[in-house]
Design a protein with these regions (language model features):
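Short amphipathic alpha-helical/adjacent loop interface patches that line ligand
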Residues: 32, 55, 189
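Short hydrophobic/aromatic-rich motifs at helix boundaries and adjacent loops
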Residues: 3-8, 86-91, 164
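Membrane-embedded hydrophobic alpha-helical segments
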Residues: 1-38
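Transmembrane helix-loop junctions and nearby membrane-interface residues
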Residues: 25-32, 61-68, 147-151
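Amphipathic, membrane-active segments
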Residues: 36-76
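An amphipathic alpha-helical interaction surface
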Residues: 83-87, 96-205
Length: 205
């Protein structure tokens, strides 16, 4: 019996060492998982802040681009046609000013769109729908301006007068309920807020 206890006593340090090692590994793994979760959460929150700021800025850019007022130099990057009178040029440049303002922010919109893929990776495809809605509005505004310019010489023919009024309503912001674009932009931003704010607030805890 004595020899058995001696052998057990000899084995105890090894067992303690093994148990300590296992406990150490568990603690390290738990710490690593916590660090990884915190790092991912921080990155997700930083992305959420950037995306939310992007959409705030995009809304302001589109609203500013649709402002009916323009300076005399705006729209001058448009290629002038041979048939244009001075009045024609002023009118057409005033139209084109909307596209010009958006073109001046082309790099911003490219960066906004590039961030979309990281956003999908963190928040899923459904959460990225506001990107599609935002670029659809931007595209509708640009198309409306292009149609107004293309049909300018034939503006009094057929259904064009009515069509052109519709395009003008899309191109220029109207401060009345008949203009749906400001409300649609606000809803797009609200959808992004609903996705991003929880991630931002969680990281701040």
């Amino acid at each position: 019996m004595t020899s058995i206890w001696i052998e057990l006593a000899k084995a105890v340090p090894s067992v303690v060492t093994a148990v300590t090692a296992v406990v150490g590994v568990c603690i390290a793994a738990r710490g690593l998982n916590k660090w990884r979760a915190e790092t991912i959460g921080k990155r997700k929150a930083e992305l959420a802040e950037d995306v939310l700021a992007d959409f705030y800025q995009a809304r302001d850019i589109i609203k500013a681009a649709r402002s009916p007022g323009s300076f005399g130099y705006e729209g001058a990057t448009r290629r002038k046609a041979d048939w244009e009178s001075e009045d024609d040029t002023r009118t057409l440049n005033a139209y084109f000013a909307t596209i010009e303002r958006l073109n001046n922010n082309a790099e911003f919109f490219a960066q906004l769109h590039a961030r979309r893929y990281r956003f999908i990776a963190h928040f899923g495809h459904d959460a990225a729908k506001p990107y599609d809605d935002l670029f659809r509005i931007r595209g509708e505004v640009i198309s409306a301006v292009q149609m107004l310019i293309m049909t300018y010489r034939d503006r009094d023919q057929g259904s064009l007068p009515a069509d052109r009024r519709d395009w003008e309503r899309i191109m220029w912001e109207r401060r009345n309920p008949a203009d749906p674009i400001p409300g649609n932009l606000d809803r797009i931003v609200e959808a992004v807020e609903n996705t991003c704010r929880p991630a931002i607030q969680e990281a701040a805890k």
